[in-house]
């Protein structure tokens, strides 16, 4: 079939071309009139035209040559007023408008880090074309990355998978990989899909980045970093540069991470992830004033970005917690939670941080239990319509930490019953953690260690998962050497947060002291006393004890 002007214009818009040339030949009394027009692809406005006449069929070819020459001249004049557009995304949809919205969504998330805008644009695209598989896939990914509405995210990724047979090979592999990763929790099959994408194009930046994520989840950070860097070399996006940054932080390569952060600020100044990375580096380096400076800078730079406002405050709350300023941490966390509530995020009503600071830092088990029970009465999980959006597993961890194994298991069982189609792999790590905490509270310390080692096997990409609990089990079993080794492993492993740092300082000091290792005891007493120098009054008795023992050791050692 002949290529019509309207179809040619749509193809040009998809490919980022400025204009198309439309032409026709009309017979008039034995002669022929040849007309060519240069038309803007974006809006159909005629930019230039020319006409030539051929007296008979023998003159048609020479007339075409003359017409071509004149049009070339006029194209040169007209194109100075045209702007060049980037090609639209090469994905399957019947709607040019939906494709434009999808392409805008990619720009929002890849170069501005604006997931909220991307989600809105993708929703608009899907209203226009409900069978737009790539938009469904991307919507699911962004909802997951933003930790929003797991039920919607799962539905979106599943819908993309259901539409995969109408897609190009590249799109089909992307839809399959997302489904295997986010719905089936089958990383091996996701890896295969991304590798097939690389068979199609070894420089596919999306495949390289996403395969890096899989390797990172499997604990192979070096391989992940290599893939991210190959992806950035093809096409720099804030997502992949952010993945490089966070991987370097997890690897403890803070100077290189800082270089990635500086590049992120330069290339993507509105992307919140680089502020987060800079705060994580400062926290790892124990630069607590730096965390405050960066969080304040983030709030000032991104005043209308509600996720940025919430995230900055959660970091400030953790920073206050680390220094024993629990009342300040609670107040800041309440501010952060209000942003979550404004965004409509499930779980924004629950005082997660207050529970853990009450139980772990204040060591007030009764008040922690009272708080937990009050949360569930004031905000019943059943009030959250979608079972998959209910934070049941967060409550499982709380009940487990309190030693209520029955309630912890009940949370897992209720969640599994509410979402029966979820693969067993989704629950394996939570079950291992629940079994481990139950064993600790039952005094079965070796069983607890086995369960938390299983957790580490199930979560190889988590730097520190299970470290504290394994150390605690050894500690309660009276195995000081093993407890010290695991507490130090927990303390010294690079991470993206460090809520236990003061507790580790305090307990390591006590363990070394008990072994007669006064040099290391003094070191950790000093670090603890310094960190909690301005702690709340309710914590100062512990600081006083540690300071007194530190001074005693110094006197003993001369």
Predicted regions and their residues:
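Acidic, proline/glycine-rich low-complexity intrinsically disordered segments
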Residues: 1-274, 278-281, 285-296, 304, ...
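Start-of-helix register in tetratricopeptide repeats
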Residues: 99-100, 134, 171-172, 206, ...
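Short coil/turn linking the two alpha-helices of tandem helical-hairpin repeats
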Residues: 106-113, 140-149, 180-185, 219, ...
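Register position in tetratricopeptide repeats
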Residues: 110-111, 145-146, 182-183, 217, ...
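Canonical tetratricopeptide repeat
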Residues: 138, 210, 243-244, 277, ...
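TPR/TPR-like alpha-solenoid repeats
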Residues: 142, 179, 214, 247, ...
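TPR/TPR-like (Sel1-like) alpha-helical repeat modules
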Residues: 144, 149-150, 154-165, 488, ...
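Solenoid-like repeat scaffolds
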Residues: 161-166, 195-200, 232-235, 262-270, ...
């Amino acid at each position: 079939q002949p290529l019509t002007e309207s179809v040619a214009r749509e193809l040009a818009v998809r490919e980022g071309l400025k204009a198309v040339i439309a032409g026709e030949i009309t017979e008039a009394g034995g002669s022929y009139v040849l007309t060519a027009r240069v038309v803007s692809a974006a809006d159909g406005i005629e930019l230039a035209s020319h006409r030539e006449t051929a007296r008979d069929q023998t003159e048609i070819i020479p007339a075409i040559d003359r017409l071509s020459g004149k049009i070339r001249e006029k194209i040169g004049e007209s194109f100075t007023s045209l702007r060049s557009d980037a090609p639209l995304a090469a994905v399957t949809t019947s709607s040019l408008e939906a494709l434009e919205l999808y392409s805008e969504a990619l720009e929002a998330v890849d170069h501005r880090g604006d997931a909220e805008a991307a989600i809105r644009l993708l929703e608009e695209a899907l209203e226009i074309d409900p069978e737009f598989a790539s938009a469904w896939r991307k919507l699911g990914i962004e909802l997951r990355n933003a930790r929003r509405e797991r039920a919607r995210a799962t539905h979106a990724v599943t819908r993309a998978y259901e539409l995969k047979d109408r897609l190009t090979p590249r799109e089909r592999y992307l839809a399959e990989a997302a489904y295997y990763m986010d719905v089936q929790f089958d990383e091996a099959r996701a890896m295969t899909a991304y590798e097939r994408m690389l068979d199609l194009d070894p420089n596919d930046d999306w495949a390289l980045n996403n395969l890096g994520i899989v390797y990172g989840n499997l604990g192979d950070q070096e391989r992940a970093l290599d893939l991210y860097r190959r992806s950035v070399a093809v096409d720099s996006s804030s997502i992949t540069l952010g993945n490089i940054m966070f991987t370097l932080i997890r690897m403890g390569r803070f100077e290189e991470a800082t270089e990635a952060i500086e590049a992120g600020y330069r290339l993507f100044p509105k992307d919140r992830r680089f502020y987060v990375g800079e705060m994580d580096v400062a926290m790892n380096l124990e630069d607590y004033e730096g965390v405050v400076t960066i969080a304040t800078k983030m709030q000032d730079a991104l005043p209308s970005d509600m996720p940025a406002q919430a995230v900055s405050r959660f970091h400030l709350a953790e920073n206050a917690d680390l220094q024993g300023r629990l009342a300040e941490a609670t107040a800041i966390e309440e501010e952060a939670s209000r942003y979550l509530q404004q965004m409509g995020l499930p779980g924004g009503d629950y005082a997660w941080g207050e529970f853990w600071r009450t139980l772990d830092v204040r060591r007030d088990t009764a008040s922690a239990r009272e708080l937990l029970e009050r949360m569930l009465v004031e905000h019943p999980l059943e009030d959250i319509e979608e079972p998959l959006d209910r934070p049941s597993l967060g409550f499982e961890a709380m009940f487990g930490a309190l030693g209520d194994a029955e309630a912890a298991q009940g949370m897992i069982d209720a969640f599994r019953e509410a979402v029966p189609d979820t693969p067993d792999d989704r629950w394996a790590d939570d079950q291992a953690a629940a079994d481990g905490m139950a064993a600790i509270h039952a005094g079965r310390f070796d069983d607890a260690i086995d369960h938390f080692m299983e957790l580490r096997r199930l979560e190889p990409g988590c730097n520190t998962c299970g470290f504290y609990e394994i150390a605690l089990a050894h500690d309660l079993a009276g195995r000081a050497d093993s407890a010290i080794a695991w507490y130090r492993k927990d303390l010294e492993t690079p991470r993206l947060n460090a809520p236990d740092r003061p507790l580790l300082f305090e307990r390591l000091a006590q363990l070394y002291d008990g072994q007669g290792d006064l040099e290391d005891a003094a070191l950790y007493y000093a670090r603890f006393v310094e960190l909690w120098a301005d702690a709340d009054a309710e914590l100062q008795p512990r600081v006083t004890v540690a300071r007194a023992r530190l001074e005693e050791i110094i006197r003993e050692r001369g």
